[in-house]
Structures are given as structure tokens and as C-alpha cells.
Amino acid sequence: MSLRQIAFYGKGGIGKSTTSQNTLAALVELDQKILIVGCDPKADSTRLILHAKAQDTVLHLAAEAGSVEDLELEDVLKIGYKGIKCVESGGPEPGVGCAGRGVITSINFLEENGAYDDVDYVSYDVLGDVVCGGFAMPIRENKAQEIYIVMSGEMMALYAANNIAKGILKYAHSGGVRLGGLICNERQTDKEIDLASALAARLGTQLIHFVPRDNIVQHAELRRMTVIEYAPDSQQAQEYRQLANKVHANKGKGTIPTPITMEELEEMLMDFGIMKSEEQQLAELQAKEAAKA
């Protein structure tokens, strides 16, 4: 089987790392060999797989050793739950340098040192509020072929998902990158599944799975475990297995996204009654003022 390079993008705090690690833990049950490359400066892309606080990052270890050339693969690559290989690229100190540089350095080092040999999936976990050059690196350099956007029914998550789709479109024609689908991580906002489905349709993709909110996820996280490991027989574990099966069956089915404008996004929110038009806001304000008079 040829190597599948997938990436999970999403705005900070959306539950992207949790969703990706639970999905990958479920993929292992399908006898898939997996390498996770964390591309988020928080370096939390592997903690549930390694049961550790935060993995030492490639950038941190390279700084200690002198340069990345002074590192060995075993210095940066750790083996976690059911043999999943884990690497964190890391980022610079806040306010200094470009976090994307760590991503570029790490991927090149891993490829040159054979980390991609003998795996079925490489999964990049990428911060997606900013689709700056560095964080777009897995897309731009034609590494990640299938992008899964983790989002919710909240306006900023929808906005970020649309922005990420713009980033994918920019490189879709020059490389082979495609949008695999949206994963909605339930926030229990109004009309959430309908909104997520509507955005997926507008972006020319699918809502690949709607992950319901369940406190068992937090219980597992406190123990630095995936739900798959902590509560394998739970309904939530089944949700992640369904998501993993859908991702596994989605090979070659990605699309070139059709992002929408900010105005179109706001119109969509108004159609769903989530956002009020300026006329409605003005009318409400006038009604309030009239009531005071």
C-alpha cells in the first residue's frame, strides 16, 4: 500500500489534536502503521499517544545538540500506543522567529533519516488560525495530500475552515493536495450539524463525521490517554472508530475546495438565523431606545 500523507488542520482550541490522536489510535486497530508529525508550537500533538506531558521537539533538541545534523532519528522519534511513531517539530520562543521553520526543518530531517519508511500513514497536526507560509508548509511542499479540517458551528471555527480551504486551493493545482473533508467537533451551538453540512457543501467537500461532545474525552485527556485506550467500549470510542473508517475509505476521494467570501459566509450564518443583518441589529437598537423613551 502506498504511503498516505494526511493532515489535520483547525483553529487553536478546536480539539484538533484530541480528534487526530483518537482517530489515529482507531486507525491502528485497522492494522495501519502510523507516524505523527506535530506541527503545532504547543507540542501537544502526541501527548495522548505517548502518555507524556509534551515531547521534546526537533527544534529544541537541535538547539541543544548544536544543529539538526547532530541529531539521530531515535533522539526525536518516540514510540507510543500500539507502535505509533511520534515526532514534534516544535516552534521558537514566543515572539521570536517563524514557527513554520521548525516544521520545514523537521520534515526534511525525518525524510532524510528514513522515518517515512515502513509506515502506511504520516499524519501532520497543524495549527490553522494562520495559514502563514510556515504552517502551510505541509501543503505547499506537496507533503500532505489529504487535508481534514476540524471545525465546529462557532463562527470563528467556520471562518478558519474557509481560510484553510483558501490555502489548499492556492496549492491544489501546482501539487496534489486535496481537501478530504470537514470533521465537526460538537460545541453544542445552534443548528451546528446543519451549518457544518452547509459549509461542507459550499466548499465542495463532505462533512466526513460529526463528533458528539462527551465528557469522557476530558476524563481520558486528564490521564493523557485517547478514548480508544481509556474506554474502548464507550460510544465515544465508536464515534472515533467510525471517523477512522471513513478516513481510511476516503483514499483518492479528496476534492479541490471552493472557498467562499466573508460576505457569503456571513450570509450563510444569517440564513441559519445565527447572525443578524445590520438592518435587524439597527431595528432592535431603535426598539430598545424607543422602549427607554
UniProtKB/Swiss-Prot annotation:
Keyword Plastid recorded: no
Q: Which Pfam families match?
A: Fer4_NifH
One annotated GO biological process: nitrogen fixation
Indicate yes or no for the key word Ribosomal protein: no
- Give the first-level EC class, as a single word: oxidoreductase
Q: Which residues carry this modification: ADP-ribosylarginine?
A: 101
Cofactor(s) recorded for this entry are:
[4Fe-4S] cluster
Task: Cite the binding residues for [4Fe-4S] cluster.
Answer: 98, 132
Report keywords, A-Z: 4Fe-4S, ADP-ribosylation, ATP-binding, Iron, Iron-sulfur, Metal-binding, Nitrogen fixation, Nucleotide-binding, Oxidoreductase
One function term, GO molecular function aspect: ATP binding
Q: Which domain of life is it from?
A: Bacteria
- Please describe the post-translational modifications of this protein: The reversible ADP-ribosylation of Arg-101 inactivates the nitrogenase reductase and regulates nitrogenase activity.
Family of the protein in this entry: Belongs to the NifH/BchL/ChlL family.
Role, per record: The key enzymatic reactions in nitrogen fixation are catalyzed by the nitrogenase complex, which has 2 components: the iron protein and the molybdenum-iron protein.
Q: Which NCBIfam families match?
A: nifH (TIGR01287)
Q: What is this protein called?
A: Nitrogenase iron protein
Taxonomic placement: Bacteria, Pseudomonadati, Pseudomonadota, Alphaproteobacteria, Rhodospirillales
